[in-house]
Amino acid sequence: MLQALLIFVLQIIYVPTLTIRTILLVKNQTRSAAGVGLLEGAIYIVSLGIVFQDLSNWMNIVAYVIGFSAGLLLGGYIENKLAIGYITYQVSLLDRCNELVNELRHFGFGVTVFEGEGINSIRYRLDIVAKRSREKELLEIINEIAPKAFMSSYEIRSFKGGYLTKAMKKRALLKKKKDEHAL
């Protein structure tokens, strides 16, 4: 029984660790992923080793499987809370909607406006880049001002230049000055 509990706890730790390592690899943070992978490998070997010691012990096998499943739920929750990386939203509008553009820029979102040809009329597309941790805030602003907008999104692997890079540098400097004044 104690072994089964240990296996369950190890799986609850192992699977979210696996999730985080995978995310770091996808985000091109290979050194961090390698560090997390050390922990992941150690947990995997210990947990599976206990199970393989006695394959007739069904409690250990059930603990492994249920722990794995619970770990997936926890890993997904952690991934959503960490919200590592950036996202781009493409927002299609019937009109230019300067109110939305100005509001998004006011709150620090990078917005580029494009004019295009729709099937029946001119359409406008906003390309908006944001940290994933601010996605909910972004969607609230869009839904408040342009609730009928068509939106699609994708995650960004990397980027260079543009408003967002300048804004990040500016925020970092302001934070540094604020921290220095706090001391």
From Swiss-Prot:
InterPro entries: DUF2179 (IPR019264), DUF5698 (IPR044035), UPF0316 (IPR022930). One of its GO terms (cellular component) is plasma membrane. Disulfide bonds: none annotated. It holds the Pfam family DUF2179. It is a multi-pass membrane protein. The keyword Cell membrane applies. The chain crosses the membrane at residues 6-26, 32-52, 58-78. It is found in: Cell membrane. Keywords: Cell membrane, Membrane, Transmembrane, Transmembrane helix. Belongs to the UPF0316 family. PANTHER family: UPF0316 PROTEIN YEBE. This is UPF0316 protein BcerKBAB4_3093.
